[in-house]
Amino acid sequence: MSSPITPLSPGCVMLPARPEPVPVDPKTTAVIVIDMQNAYASPGGYLDLAGFDISGAAKVIHEIKGVLEVARSAGMQVIYFQNGWDDQYVEAGGPGSPNWWKSNALKTMRAKPELQGKLLARGQWDYELVDELKPQPGDIQLHKTRYSGFFNSQLDSVLRARGIRHLVFVGIATNVCVESTLRDGFFLEYFGTVLEDATHQAGPEFVQKAALFNIESFFGWVSTTADFKGTFGQLAPRT
């Protein structure tokens, strides 16, 4: 059985989670919204065109919307990530980059040349956030060019400047960009918690379970939207 986690600040409240409850202070916590773009959550977006099942995306959008309302009211910083590249795909890397070979978006465009310039390119519909989850005043938007939100981005400096130590993750895909960003945060001494029903995998259902197992066993904690809203929704709104 795990030992109780020592709160990092006096403002912490205990968030029910696996493998044990985790102390979270809203003032030092950010909700990280991973890649809730048309590419990953809308019919006709990259994941859909690449043959992945996105049927769970609508529920994830609904769950994230409720989480963000509570998070903002509790005084948490909300940070949105958008994954993609410039419209010439210079940022994606050429054949000398493993990203060029492993990115399913790039592979899909090579297989279907008519899609070239449309998938995950800034300025295109595919890159844009879904309409239901547009940022609000005070939210932060960041761009990333690889699976991890910490790679070549401003995320670490943005968090440190605000004294943020705990990251709550929502978004798509659990087994790719969510897990990659949480793992890199772990290596930089950030506490990471994923809300399992506010995420969705790219691939079969077993990869969702595997990603959550990895997170709760080795890199962070797993909670639910109900527990998050139940814990922080009762706090007095912060201005």
UniProtKB/Swiss-Prot annotation:
PANTHER family: ISOCHORISMATASE-LIKE DOMAIN-CONTAINING PROTEIN, PEROXYUREIDOACRYLATE/UREIDOACRYLATE AMIDOHYDROLASE-RELATED. SUPFAM superfamilies: Isochorismatase-like hydrolases. Hydrolyzes ureidoacrylate to form aminoacrylate and carbamate. The carbamate hydrolyzes spontaneously, thereby releasing one of the nitrogen atoms of the pyrimidine ring as ammonia and one of its carbon atoms as CO2. One of its GO terms (molecular function) is hydrolase activity, acting on carbon-nitrogen (but not peptide) bonds, in linear amides. It catalyses: (Z)-3-ureidoacrylate + H2O + H(+) = (Z)-3-aminoacrylate + NH4(+) + CO2; (Z)-3-ureidoacrylate + H2O = (Z)-3-aminoacrylate + carbamate + H(+); (Z)-2-methylureidoacrylate + H2O + H(+) = (Z)-2-methylaminoacrylate + NH4(+) + CO2. The lineage of its organism: Bacteria, Pseudomonadati, Pseudomonadota, Alphaproteobacteria, Caulobacterales. It is an enzyme of class 3 (hydrolase). Belongs to the isochorismatase family. RutB subfamily. It comes from the Bacteria. Keywords: Hydrolase. InterPro entries: Isochorismatase-like_dom, Isochorismatase-like_hydrls, Isochorismatase-like_sf, RutB. Signal peptide: none annotated. One of its GO terms (biological process) is nitrogen utilization. This is Ureidoacrylate amidohydrolase RutB. The active site is at 35 (proton acceptor), 144, 177 (nucleophile). Pfam families: Isochorismatase. Its EC number is 3.5.1.110.
